[in-house]
Amino acid sequence: MAEGYDAALSVAEWLRALHLEQYTALFEQHGLVWATECQGLSDAGLLDMGMHLPGHRRRILAGLHRAHAPPVPLPRPAPRPVPMKRHIFRSPPVPVTPPEPPPTAGEDEGLPAAPPIPPRRSCLPPACFTPTSTAAPDPVLPPLPAKRHLVEPSVPPVPPRTGPPYPQASLLAKEELLLPSVSPRSQPEPAETPSTLLPAFPQGPLQPPSPPPCPPVIPPKPPRLLPEFDDSDYDDVPEEGPGAPASVMTKEEPLPSRVPRAVRVASLLSEGEELSGDDSEDDDDHAYEGIPNGGWPTSGLNPPLRSLIPDLPLHPMDELPGGPTPITPVIKAGWLDKNPPQGSYIYQKRWVRLDADYLRYFDSNKDAYSKRFVPVACICRVAPIGDQKFEVITNNRTFAFRAESDVERNEWMQALQQAVVEHRARFRLSSASVLGVRGSEQPDRAGSLELRGFKNKLYVAVTGDKVQLYKNLEEFHLGIGITFIDMNVGNVKEVDRRSFDLTTPYRIFSFSADSELEKEQWLEAMQGAIAEALSTSEVAERIWAAAPNRFCADCGAAQPDWASINLCVVICKRCAGEHRGLGAGVSKVRSLKMDRKVWTEALIQLFLHLGNGPGNHFWAANVPPSEALEPSSSPGARRYHLEAKYREGKYRRYHPLFGNQEELDKALCAAVTTTDLAETQALLGCGAGVSCFSGDPAAPTPLALAEQAGQTLQMEFLRNNQSTEVPRLDSVKPLEKHYSVTLPTVSHSGFLYKTASAGKPLQDRRAREEFSRRWCVLSDGVLSYYENERAVTPNGEIRASEIVCLAVSPLDTHGFEHTFEVYTEGERLYLFGLENAELAHEWVKCIAKAFVPPLAEDLLARDFERLGRLPCKAGLSLQQAQEGWFALTGSELRAVFPEGPWEEPLQLRKLQELSIQGDSENQVLVLVERRRTLYIQGERRLDFMAWLGVIQKAAASLGDTLSEQQLGDSDIPVIVYRCVDYITQCGLTSEGIYRKCGQTSKTQRLLDSLRQDARSVHLKEGEQHVDDVSSALKRFLRDLPDGLFTRAQRLAWLEASEIEDEEEKISRYRELLVHLPPVNRATVKALISHLYCVQCFSDTNQMNTHNLAIVFGPTLFQTDGQDYKAGKVVEDLINHYVVVFSVDEEELRKQREEVTAIVKMRVAGTASGTQHAGDFICTVYLEEKKVETEQHVKIPASMTAEELTLEILDRRNVSIREKDYWTCFEVNEKEEAERPLHFAEKVLPIVHGLGIDSHLVVKKYQSMEAMLLYLASRVGDTKHGMMKFREDRSLLGLGLPSGGFHDRYFILNSSCLRLYKEVRSQRPWSGAPETSHRPEKEWPVKSLKVYLGVKKKLRPPTCWGFTVVHETEKHEKQQWYLCCDTQMELREWFATFLSVQHDGLVWPSEPSRVSRAVPEVRMGSVSLIPLRGSENEMRRSVAAFTADPLSLLRHV
């Protein structure tokens, strides 16, 4: 029998059934492919094969023993007790004397004839015969089918969209079988076929049982872990007929464990107790084994294993085409008694509900989630089993129920039978429908999870908009589960590293995954289910009105609910994932159900007129059958097909004008003025320029022509294809070419210290305790890590083909001195560490060799800080992205492209531009150096953000020396270039330029920003004064550690100035200039060239060569200015600029012309009054927004909130009294909030950022006095406490509110605002409570804007609230609402915010409020040192400036 049943069983399927699939490769290595080949294995043989765990060996040998053991005679089961009414008690059984023992199972062959078959009521024990009984025995019900366990296909089945999966075997084997109609009093008659004969049973005792003296003791029910949702019905015992409890058996009766069981079919598959790991399996689990159901042939219900894995979909969809149906109405519901799975005599009351799809039962009629559900498609037969009882029989399980009366029992049976018949009719109708039905849908995520309240893991499947819970994988395949959760009422939330909560209005499901990676994958899948549940099918149904749009344009799957809006094709979910991989330049993927805002009426009409019909007529005109996709195609096949179809245009129908660009453009311009959308699609797909010139200046582009012709659909199609790439046959992704080359075989092994993988960049230092010691093996392109060197099964592995980046961390970045990071395509980051530098370096080199292709092996010749591949555009192929290999070493970025020559390294500190373009999802890093531009795309966010950070850091200034600064094309530091260029543009005619000093605070802020990232600083007139910029330049040159002329050559320069012979002196200068470092030499030339231009306008700026030398001599040579040697060198260099620096006449003439033109333009601008072009006129209100209170104010770039307030009060003649705190407020009417501007805050940026619902108001700030008193009396600069908190963000972008206000604990210190879910530490305040535990959220405090007030629409719990707005570097705004309990608490929080954000200066000191005049924009133009006088006076003034610039302000 074993041979007939399991002959075709492969080793992989057999081991999977035993839950030992990890040994599949081991068996195949030893030539064991089929299960029958394993018959001769022994314990020693398994050990020699490498199987070291004794429990696994015993499980395999037990399976072999069961499969190949000789058949045993059919045992006779012991007599079983008959259930009585609850008020009737059983008498103790009559003891059997030793001379007359009951027959045993081994005596069957010696009996002359089989004893009469006792009457049996389905799953109940056989009734005893009595000698005085005259009534006819109860009719025997048709025998039931043998239960088959653990039929597990090699590919996981796909549950349907609208509910849990249905067992396919029940649909296929019995689709044509009709259910018998059951009359109210009729009993099913036994079938007369031999297969229905029951095995012989031993005859029971002849005496009738006498009533017992006392009722049996019923074992107490174990307490529930969760009162509202226990797992008493989900024990490892399947739900079958009842068995006799141990408490009602006497010593003479055989114990349940000794009752012989029916013979099982020999099988290599493991038994239920081996899978569950529980040896205490109930006897009723086998009550019907070997007995077919309803007299149907056993052979029809017990096919070989492979026949249970058919080619048809395992879980057919049971609704009609047209999308998911609404909630199924309940057919019948009511209370029924249900036989428990433990076989107890005590029936349990259950609320049972039947709809068109499921039979479910609950603890009560108020429960939202069932204890069990049985798909109607799984029900084979419904049969009565006695008074008021009936059975629901599936292909694998039998469920027994008892009603209050026979009438109710018959009503339930009739409803169930009718539901089954109608379900099968619907299935036949949907299968035959011309529209087709949605193909079997793979679960978005399926696997085992721990659920709080359950002792064993549950099998969880996320399919469509439901989360389904099953007891194990077997039940998932059978379709009979615990419950399912509709995600339209669900929300998922991360709890800790491995746990998350699924919250519904009825219950919180707390799940735990095996790893942090699995948890994030489950979160993503469940969030997708929520999005799908909250979607609408209105757009989909409209687009499906066109027949071709009802099937996926690529694989043919029915009812596709995604689309590519630029290609104008409707696609299924699985193809949509691969379309996204093509990039937005090829396919812009949108959902028909979730992206509702995208689907304008014009776009819907475009899909109805174009869509899949004409689309495939063009794109798929030449698809060979061997390359066509099917709904079941693998992701790899889809990816290959879609690359060829849309990126390369391999299967497209070529236009007759293909290859003639000019004619294609003309034809496109003609086509867009007509309604022929297919022609427009064909022209664009064959290379016509979407923005080509039409020849008509009034309508220069095809889009303008379509608009002129009133062709709305043509306009929509052209807009969607503005950035679409033209298909090219040579556009195969370079990665495919990379990996077609055999990579070198690298092998390495050893111990590494490893942390858990992360899905986010590592922001914090990982302590040594967070690392685990692992034995790592790199072999055959796989990096595997084991628990130790003796372990056989790896804890995990990283394939070299999936590695996208390898980074070496700086020393002591983490707990180990040497660490490196590995990034994979799955957005995971692995951190490894070692103490030994040589071992760490060897590991890095081996891993790099394993994943870098031969074309980029030159990158391994030098040590690198980061190595990997990134999609980019460079050179002449800017239309097509390619995969480039990059290596970062210091400030050099070396790149290798698959189809390009080796290029010089990119000097990051010499970049002309480093910027980030695009939105948060499609970021592009732009690097511009000399004549090269490189666009690096952020296809994978994790490694892209890491690359972005290190490139920005490498491109920034590394130190204070000149060579460590950001450099320009000619090796001039960007700081010097920015300052010199600004002064050339704005300060050549400024009187006393370089002699006057700017404001110290502004100068320092400007210099700090220039030192941090000079490339991103753009100096603008009106925002920075020329004296501030000139002072910043002088301070930068003076603070150089080595000086501009270097410490080694400084003395030689000073000595050269004393040479009397001019020619010899100039020659010496030129000689010294050659010996300067390249950056110093270029900087000296640029600076002297600038000073030469400044002295050309000495008549206006009063800065001749001598005056400039007095200023720059001590600055460049870092002297005290008491002698003139340093000044003499500068003066000589300016006077002999042309000779010393070898400037030809043409260059000198061009330089003079440029400078002269700049000065003329400034003079013309000053005469016409347009020098303040940056000023802005804004409406400001006094006290309230009324027409009579508005003032139109001209706001220059330098105006502060204090200056604006004073000007408004001056205009209205409002006097400021003592303790009047007039302030300018930014009022947002939409948010019902306002923000008092800080007195030093610049107004112009705020005015530019005001929306239509915002305005500025000058009014008294009533709370300022109380806030100042609080700040004066408080201790420390921190605040903490509880507040009501609400986050204002959309749920998955659907615009749904995120809930109400919740209590949260906040800590505000000098650097950040932190949010905690609860207060964990009860210790007294120590000034640093934030160290007690990690916060739930954290924001930098200086980047927050705090508005007083919360809009009433949110129903704040108190009226003392404020709104916090945070704007990220990408200009993304996030908003939160906080409420305090009292007004005083609100004032304290707001005062602390202002104090922290402005370094304690909340309100200006009193003297600064006395002056009512608006400061002059050019106040800094006042001369602070004499412009004329003797040389000694000038020298003394410069020396005083170098000593203390602020001392010069004493007499001003």
Swiss-Prot record:
Pfam families the UniProt entry points to: ArfGap, PH, RA, RhoGAP, SAM_1
Cellular localization per UniProt: Cytoplasm; Golgi apparatus, trans-Golgi network; Golgi apparatus, Golgi stack membrane; Cell membrane
Major location (coarse): cytoplasm
SUPFAM superfamilies in the cross-refs: ArfGap/RecO-like zinc finger, GTPase activation domain, GAP, PH domain-like, SAM/Pointed domain
Keywords: Cell junction, Cell membrane, Cell projection, Cytoplasm, Endosome, Golgi apparatus, GTPase activation, Membrane, Metal-binding, Phosphoprotein, Repeat, Zinc, Zinc-finger
GO molecular function, one term: phosphatidylinositol-3,4,5-trisphosphate binding
Region called Disordered, residue ranges: 87-258, 271-304
Start and end residues of each Arf-GAP domain: 537-662
Region (Required for interaction with SH3KBP1): 81-90
Tissue: Expressed in the retina where it is detected in Mueller glia (at protein level). Also detected in the retinal pigment epithelium (at protein level). Expressed in osteoclasts (at protein level).
Positions with biased composition (Pro residues): 92-104, 154-167, 205-225
Effect of gene knockout: Progressive retinal degeneration from postnatal week 4 with the fundus developing pigmentary changes, retinal vascular attenuation, optic nerve pallor and outer retinal thinning. Defective phagocytosis in the retinal pigment epithelium. Conditional knockout in the retinal pigment epithelium results in optic nerve pallor, attenuated retinal arteries, retinal pigmentary changes and outer retinal thinning. Conditional knockout in Mueller glia results in mice which are phenotypically indistinguishable from the wild type.
A Gene Ontology term for the protein's cellular component: early endosome
SMART domains reported in the protein's UniProt record: ArfGap, PH, RhoGAP, SAM
Modification Phosphoserine, positions: 232, 430, 740, 1430, 1437
Gene3D superfamilies, A to Z: Arf GTPase activating protein, Phosphatidylinositol 3-kinase Catalytic Subunit, Chain A, domain 1, Pleckstrin-homology domain (PH domain)/Phosphotyrosine-binding domain (PTB), Rho GTPase activation protein, Transcription Factor, Ets-1
Zinc finger (C4-type): 552-575
Binding partners and assembly: Interacts with SH3KBP1/CIN85 (via SH3 domains). The interaction is independent of EGF and does not affect ARAP1 GTPase-activating activity but is involved in regulating ubiquitination and endocytic trafficking of EGFR. ARAP1 competes with E3 ubiquitin-protein ligase CBL for binding to SH3KBP1, preventing interaction of CBL with SH3KBP1; this is likely to regulate SH3KBP1-mediated internalization of EGFR. Interacts with TNFRSF10A.
Free-text note regarding domains: The first PH domain, PH 1, interacts with PtdIns(3,4,5)P3 which stimulates ARAP1 GTPase-activating activity and is also required for ARAP1-mediated regulation of endocytic trafficking of EGFR. It does not mediate PtdIns(3,4,5)P3-dependent recruitment of ARAP1 to membranes although this may be mediated by other PH domains.
Protein name, as recorded: Arf-GAP with Rho-GAP domain, ANK repeat and PH domain-containing protein 1
Organism this protein belongs to: Mus musculus
Gene that encodes the chain: Arap1
